[in-house]
Amino acid sequence: MASLYITKNGVSLGLKANRIYISKEGEETKEIPIHKVDRIIIFEGVKISSNLIQYSIENNIEINFLKESGQYLGRVSGGEHDRAEIVRKQVLLTSDENFRVEMSKKIIKSKLSNQITILLRRKKIDESITKNIDLIKRMKVNIENCKSVEEIMGHEGISAKEYFEGISKTINEEFAFDGRSKRPPKDMFNAMISMAYTLLFSEINSIAASKGLYVYAGFMHSDKKGHPALISDFIEEWRSIICDSTVITIINKKCIKKEDFNFNEDGSVYLNKNGRKILVEYMTRKLNSEINYFGKSMTYREALSRQIDSFIEVLKNDDVSLYKVSNTR
């Protein structure tokens, strides 16, 4: 089964004889057997027929909607599990301060370990990033003694600044950037990682919702109307090893160029349709590539699913130690 990404404006999706028909300006360009698709991701400006939406709901094919900028808008799905007991336990525990602190420690320490790994791989390019690595290591140690989620996130914020400074020193000069910028991204690197984070966010959101979790009740990120806070929690430790490493690969291989971006008068920078196509292709490859996750070889997609299973075990047993983090080497 595969995810179907539609990134181009003016494209229409329809359903006929159990096949998805993709057309533009009235002319069919492609058809795909619907049984080969388990998720459809469409960007702003794409039309989708009501019969395809109905079929998707009835057959548990999720449809995700993204803005042209890559911002996640929402999803349509059917057949989600009725797991009221798990949801009650989730809401109860995500309101428990001790649980919130211990889960946040586990995830953010894993996130920092993965950031250190990414920087160590690039240390030979610029030895000066040793100081960035050392500071992140200190923040990781400090987190162990934190008494609140806010304190943990303060250390995470310092680490993020050091991490992105280190990345900027070691990538192609054309893509160098001055820190993390979002809503809107202000340079090509930030445009790419913002889009990559959205693609990963929708992937994790689909997995978590399909397993019956209430995606709006998180333990680390604060509740916001309409925002799946739990997914913002889950994604943290995976950002660097899935998204950032993918973007660095694209830059290193010179697969993307300035012409693949839109530079706007307000200073914002976004991928254009060709740029989105390139990023989607490489993110799909990454998610289908293998990782060693707790002694077993599996794809990143499978690891994401296994990790969410481990979170469900945490809820069932009220035991944070059962959560399997994503540390890589």
List each model region and its residues.
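Active-site helix-to-loop segments that bind/position phosphate- or nucleotide-bearing substrates
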Residues: 1-16, 25, 31, 73, ...
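Short hydrophobic alpha-helical runs that function as membrane-insertion/retention elements
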Residues: 40-43, 61-67
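Extracellular/luminal Protease-associated
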Residues: 34-48
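Hydrophobic residues embedded in beta-strands of well-ordered beta-sheets
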Residues: 20-21
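Short gly/pro/ser/thr-enriched loop/turn and capping motifs at secondary-structure boundaries
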Residues: 49, 70-75
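Short low-complexity, flexible loop/linker segments enriched in glycine and/or proline
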Residues: 78-81
